[in-house]
């Protein structure tokens, strides 16, 4: 083979290889440009008029399902989408439901505010307590908690001695006899002179037996804490031996107290235990 033919064959091969490489590069460039145009929406064609309002103020958005045959447009005047070759739907952008949700949320907040206001302003309504003044338990922002107890005690001092001490103003005995003028938790037949105090207090009944009642910190007499006093020497006459036993502790009634306030005997130096004998008698300790 001639050397000239060999050179010509080599040149042809190089030309073909270079041409194929160049064509491949051109194809890649074309594909990249097409992708860019598709992403920009330039292949959607010219700006089309809106099929609803016939406004030219439209723009290309995207292709449905990545199909070039279904370009989707948006009309800026009527603010609606449409797809070329598809059906028209009267659905605005965002829809009117979003505004409705905002209005409903604002109305809901207003209702909550009204409920909270009514909760603080409305007086306490209880079908069991009808004669109670609203200022006794009604919450007021301008009154402190300490002042609330002061007003409650002031209302008690202005009431009668035989009326219940919660300011109910009448015969209100839920657990006791309806004829007795006792507080809420009055339990036995007889008329007791109840009063509002903090600590221990006694009531005088028709059975002539002194009783000690436990009053809670809110001035409410507790039925479970009411226990009868019993003499240590098992004598029914209270004048012979005024020493009493209450919850296992010896108490002594002074002569000036007249059966109203129990006091601890200052002369007792030792308790001699909780269950020791006292004057040859057993201590009857009631369980609370």
Swiss-Prot record:
Pfam family, one: Zn_ribbon_Dof
Residues at which Zn(2+) binds: 50, 53, 75, 78
Region (Disordered) residue spans: 97-120
Keywords linked to the UniProt accession: DNA-binding, Metal-binding, Nucleus, Transcription, Transcription regulation, Zinc, Zinc-finger
Low complexity compositional bias, start-end: 103-118
Gene Ontology molecular function, alphabetical: DNA-binding transcription factor activity; transcription cis-regulatory region binding; zinc ion binding
Gene Ontology BP annotations: regulation of DNA-templated transcription
Superkingdom of the organism of origin: Eukaryota
One Gene Ontology CC term in the entry: nucleolus
Dof-type zinc-finger residues: 48-102
Main location as per UniProt: nucleus
Tissue: Accumulates in the stele.
Localization annotation: Nucleus
UniProt-listed InterPro entries: Dof, Znf_Dof
PANTHER family per the UniProt record, alphabetical: DOF ZINC FINGER PROTEIN DOF1.4-RELATED (PTHR31992), DOF ZINC FINGER PROTEIN DOF2.1 (PTHR31992:SF335)
Role this protein plays: Transcription factor that binds specifically to a 5'-AA[AG]G-3' consensus core sequence.
Name of the protein: Dof zinc finger protein DOF2.1
Gene that specifies this protein: DOF2.1
């Amino acid at each position: 083979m001639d050397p000239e033919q060999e050179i010509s064959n080599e040149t042809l091969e190089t030309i073909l290889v270079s041409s194929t490489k160049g064509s491949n590069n051109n194809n890649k460039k074309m594909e990249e440009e097409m992708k860019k145009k598709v992403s920009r929406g330039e292949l959607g064609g010219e700006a089309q008029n809106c099929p609803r309002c016939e406004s030219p103020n439209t723009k290309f958005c995207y292709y449905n399902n990545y199909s070039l045959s279904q370009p989707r447009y948006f009309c800026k005047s009527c603010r609606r989408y449409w797809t070329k070759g598809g059906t028209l739907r009267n659905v605005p952008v965002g829809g009117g439901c979003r505004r409705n949700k905002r209005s409903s949320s604002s109305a809901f907040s207003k209702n909550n505010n009204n409920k909270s206001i009514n909760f603080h302003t409305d007086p306490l309504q209880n079908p069991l307590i009808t004669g109670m003044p609203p200022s006794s338990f009604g919450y007021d922002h301008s009154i402190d908690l300490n002042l609330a107890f002061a007003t409650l005690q002031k209302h008690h001092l202005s009431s009668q001695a035989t009326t219940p001490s919660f300011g109910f103003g009448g015969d209100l005995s839920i657990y006791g006899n309806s004829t007795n003028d006792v507080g809420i938790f009055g339990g036995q037949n007889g008329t007791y002179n109840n009063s509002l105090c903090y600590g221990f207090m006694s009531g005088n009944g028709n059975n002539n037996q002194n009783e000690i009642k436990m009053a809670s910190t809110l001035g409410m007499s507790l039925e479970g804490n009411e226990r009868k006093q019993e003499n240590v020497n098992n004598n029914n006459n209270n004048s012979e031996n005024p020493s009493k036993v209450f919850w296992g502790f010896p108490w002594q009634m002074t002569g000036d107290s007249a059966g109203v306030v129990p006091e601890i005997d200052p002369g007792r130096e030792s308790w001699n235990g909780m269950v020791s004998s006292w004057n040859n008698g057993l201590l009857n300790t009631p369980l609370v």
